[in-house]
Amino acid sequence: DAKRLVTCGCDNLVKIWRRDETQNAWGCEATLSAHADWVRDVAWSENLGLPMNTIASCGQDGKVFIWTQSEPRGPWQSRQLHDFGAPVWRVSWSTMGNILAVSDGNNTVTIWKESVDGTWNQISAAA
């Protein structure tokens, strides 16, 4: 299994990097674009043996996106989780990978859960 990591930054992009052991270097495998301003945080969800990869990204634009890749080296698909109306600072997955915590500029932490049909619902909030 290849080593990969995800980064974000002030270029409004999320980048997936893959380690090339033969070259002893990291190469950009994919560039994901959906945010209209700085991407503040990214988090890779545990896949628990499933053949799917899931990443959450959040940004200065107030949006959180869920990115999915259903097969190795396949295309990444994005879905907007929510527009928070204020910068979003952090995203963090549960160990099972089906619950996402989001911290935004309204001084609120919201908890979101993915349902069986793939929709995301807010299940909790704390200010």
Model regions and ranges:
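Structural signature of WD-repeat beta-propeller blades
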Residues: 3, 40-43, 53, 89
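Structural hallmark of WD40 beta-propellers
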Residues: 1-6, 49-56, 66, 97-101
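Blade-level signature of beta-propeller repeat domains, shared across WD40, Kelch, NHL, RCC1
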Residues: 94-126
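WD40/WD-repeat beta-propeller blade N-cap
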Residues: 32-39, 80-88, 126-127
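Beta-strand initiation motifs
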Residues: 22-28, 72-78, 117-123
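Residue-level recognition of a conserved intra-blade site in WD40 beta-propeller repeats
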Residues: 44, 48-49, 93
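Conserved strand-to-loop turn within each blade of WD40 beta-propeller repeats
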Residues: 7-11, 57-61, 102-106
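WD40-repeat beta-propellers
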Residues: 14-19, 42, 64-69, 109-114
